[in-house]
Amino acid sequence: MMCGAPSATQPATAETQAIADKVKSQLEEKENKKFPVFKALEFKSQLVAGKNYFIKVQVDEDDFVHIRVFESLPHENKPVALTSYQTNKGRHDELTYF
């Protein structure tokens, strides 16, 4: 992966789901609602001074959210953080940089 360039879209992994799960409560707080479903479907990553993850998450049968999560470098010992998100996305909406 080249520093600064987002990776190609890939199917979500168990690691991706774990990252999404760590920021679920942050998104629920920002949106003031609970998501009974929170399933990571696909993702891109971007190597910066840490790593950005762009993750497409299914939050209901036909409702999707794109989240951007920042994971700091290991020596910084900081939790992952929800840095941005886009709501009202569909299953076929392309996951892009935002």
Curated annotation (Swiss-Prot):
Subcellular location: Cytoplasm
InterPro entries tied to this protein: Cystatin_dom (IPR000010), Cystatin_sf (IPR046350), Prot_inh_cystat_CS (IPR018073), Prot_inh_stefin (IPR001713)
Annotated Pfam families: Cystatin
Sorted UniProt keywords: Acetylation, Cytoplasm, Protease inhibitor, Thiol protease inhibitor
GO molecular function: cysteine-type endopeptidase inhibitor activity
SUPFAM superfamilies hit by this protein: Cystatin/monellin (SSF54403)
Motif (Secondary area of contact): 46-50
Main localization category: cytoplasm
Superkingdom of this protein's organism: Eukaryota
Single GO cellular component term: cytosol
CDD domains: CY
Modified residues (N-acetylmethionine): M1
SMART domains: CY
Annotated site, Reactive site, chain positions: G4
Keyword Ribonucleoprotein included in the entry's annotation: no
Free-text function comment from the UniProt entry: This is an intracellular thiol proteinase inhibitor.
Family assignment from sequence similarity: Belongs to the cystatin family.
Subunit structure: Able to form dimers stabilized by noncovalent forces.
Name recorded for this polypeptide: Cystatin-B
Organism: Ovis aries (Sheep)
